[in-house]
Amino acid sequence: MEAESPCAASDLAVARRELLSGNHRELDPVGLRQTWLDLHESWLIDKADEIGIADASGFAIVGVGGLGRRELLPYSDLDVLLLHDGKPADILRPVADRLWYPLWDANIRLDHSVRTVSEALTIANSDLMAALGMLEARHIAGDQQLSFALIDGVRRQWRNGIRSRMGELVEMTYARWRRCGRIAQRAEPDLKLGRGGLRDVQLLDALALAQLIDRHGIGHTDLPAGSLDGAYRTLLDVRTELHRVSGRGRDHLLAQFADEISAALGFGDRFDLARTLSSAGRTIGYHAEAGLRTAANALPRRGISALVRRPKRRPLDEGVVEYAGEIVLARDAEPEHDPGLVLRVAAASADTGLPIGAATLSRLAASVPDLPTPWPQEALDDLLVVLSAGPTTVATIEALDRTGLWGRLLPEWEPIRDLPPRDVAHKWTVDRHVVETAVHAAPLATRVARPDLLALGALLHDIGKGRGTDHSVLGAELVIPVCTRLGLSPPDVRTLSKLVRHHLLLPITATRRDLNDPKTIEAVSEALGGDPQLLEVLHALSEADSKATGPGVWSDWKASLVDDLVRRCRMVMAGESLPQAEPTAPHYLSLAADHGVHVEISPRDGERIDAVIVAPDERGLVSKAAAVLALNSLRVHSASVNVHQGVAITEFVVSPLFGSPPAAELVRQQFVGALNGDVDVLGMLQKRDSDAASLVSARAGDVQAGVPVTRTAAPPRILWLDTAAPAKLILEVRAMDRAGLLALLAGALEGAGAGIVWAKVNTFGSTAADVFCVTVPAELDARAAVEQHLLEVLGASVDVVVDEPVGD
């Protein structure tokens, strides 16, 4: 019997078992990995010396995978490549056998291959996974020239070929993310392959080797959420402990091991571990997504594409542009002096579905001052746009949160950030849940009279969690200073406080109490102070909250019970007052006295402007006035229309999309031309919108693959309200706001033969709620004609067209 080799793998196996025994628990994960690496690397070096694998021998041992990265974990495969310079089989086979067989005999998991440098490069050129693995190759023993030829060759080949392989790399990454899910939102996450896992950092390393991203720069950037390298070390340490605790090469962190791993790493309990993993996974996931975009935009341009003009910068808001499929700062932006810029950038991202550029986020985080208290109305409106955008809200808030900007806007966010749910019915961490609630509330925006309160209620309804007390009670207290800081009026602050306090009231009562008992209905109505508007918003919030909790939480059965409860409560609450015309200032009444055309433009507090147009009333006046403002790139935030002694007084609160507002005399000239029929301002507005839509469609190909452009539009609603005067009706149109919407709605009413007696217009973030008091022709189908004209403007089938009598 042949004597055992001096470098027998049985000794290695004994040393491995000893290292993993309870005698070495003092080794932390870093120490365990280093000791484990030294153990195996020393064995390979000694074995190489024994079997003649030396410098200039024509053989080399190269480590790949964890061995190549110096991150060898217990129970992971030993990834080894035996390189040779073209040795014949009779020389090659004995050397390979003497290297592999001792490891096999010792039951050490081995992932091995035998290649020449040319063969290895050929495989790396055809197999993307093999290429990524070889990018991590490291010389262990033997002929250094062979190892360096492989390492240099595979990296040069990777750099030269990245342009043709980028599409496959992106597709493979997104397929893995879909298959393995996010680390941050999985009860048993895949630490290696999950979205935000270890493999994503290795992806970034590969992009850096292709010279497409600055890996060192992003790795050491210490954001409030933690650095990329710190997040990677966290996951690596947890995975190391998972191997040690489970005794297997696991990548999925099963719940049964969580408490022991938490104790070993000093995290407290499994909930603390889950919170730490969520933060690390989100940090890595953010950098991975940003890295893919940065790399795609940095790809070298060749052939015909090199002759094509670079993408244009498309203005979106003051200081904000779209460039190459990302939201970035305009060249003349001054973030150091513009505290509202963060939310304008965020609103543009949420509204378009385009991601915010990583460099833009870094610059904003480093230089933008905090918003004043209370917030300007413009900042609150931009926040509402973010919250009302639908699915794109998630990525926008995530980008702000990972870079510390969201926490500066809402310091109260910290206790719920990455907070794991205590209830198994919950799918998301608490912070993600409230964002998902806003996503589910967005399609319900036109179902309520105050979509702004719905959006803010969705964001803040669980703000009291994570503090060891009744989150509804504490949350109701917390939202008072929050909403005051945001600039809400005292009545709205009180309403939101009640909304948070009672956000569980409707579903709990509907599913646990007898709805036929009058005392049940009285108790709910009394808790809500008899406020039908609060009930309406709470109804929508209850639905959004349940849908955001998890699959099946909002069922048809539950919806029917809540609907029944709300119906019964409305019956016992006081009726809502009819909308009324806004009073007109005496100054404008005096202007109306001479029956001329007057235009006044004057600044308000902040960025907003009063634009008042006074002219003799005639059909089409309101639509033409609003169209002139829209054509001058003025965004209408609110408006009122009144007719006094045959003269229409239209008061608008507007803000310029870019730059300074137009001069009043210019607006007057354009308006007079529209009244005289010299200029078709409505036609110009419709053509501008059509051209803009075509431009967006044509540029869709510029958006990088894997960046979804998905926006949620709440279905429009038309509500008819009967008045005491039979000849007049009040009509409310709720729809997603867009440039020129007021002009188009007024034009539709006028085109249907309706006369506008007065109007009151409000925009809540991205949702418009426009009330018109109109006279309609006496024909039986007059309402239907009005609705049809409005439908054509709204561009969608109306969700609900209702007669809703409201009394005093």
From Swiss-Prot:
Signal peptide: none annotated. Its cofactor is Mg(2+). One of its GO terms (molecular function) is [protein-PII] uridylyltransferase activity. Disruption phenotype: Cells lacking this gene have no growth defect in media containing different nitrogen sources. Total glutamine synthetase (GS) activity in culture filtrates is markedly reduced in the mutant, although activity in cell-free extracts remains normal. Virulence is unaffected in both in vitro and in vivo model systems of infection. Disulfide bonds: none annotated. GO terms for biological process: regulation of nitrogen utilization. Residues 430-544 form the HD domain. InterPro entries: ACT-like_dom_sf (IPR045865), ACT_dom (IPR002912), HD/PDEase_dom (IPR003607), HD_domain (IPR006674), NT_sf (IPR043519), PII_UdlTrfase/GS_AdlTrfase (IPR013546), UTase/UR (IPR010043). Uridylyltransferase (UTase) activity is inhibited by glutamine, while glutamine activates uridylyl-removing (UR) activity. Its EC number is 2.7.7.59, 3.1.4.-. GO terms for cellular component: peptidoglycan-based cell wall; plasma membrane. Residues 610-686, 730-805 form the ACT domain. Residues 1-315 are annotated as: Uridylyltransferase. PROSITE patterns: ACT, HD. Belongs to the GlnD family. NCBIfam families: PRK03381.1, UTase_glnD. Modifies, by uridylylation and deuridylylation, the PII regulatory protein (GlnB), in response to the nitrogen status of the cell that GlnD senses through the glutamine level. Under low glutamine levels, catalyzes the conversion of the PII protein and UTP to PII-UMP and PPi, while under higher glutamine levels, GlnD hydrolyzes PII-UMP to PII and UMP (deuridylylation). Thus, controls uridylylation state and activity of the PII protein, and plays an important role in the regulation of nitrogen assimilation and metabolism. Has four distinct domains: an N-terminal nucleotidyltransferase (NT) domain responsible for UTase activity, a central HD domain that encodes UR activity, and two C-terminal ACT domains that seem to have a role in glutamine sensing. This is Bifunctional uridylyltransferase/uridylyl-removing enzyme. It comes from Mycobacterium tuberculosis (strain ATCC 25618 / H37Rv). The gene is glnD.
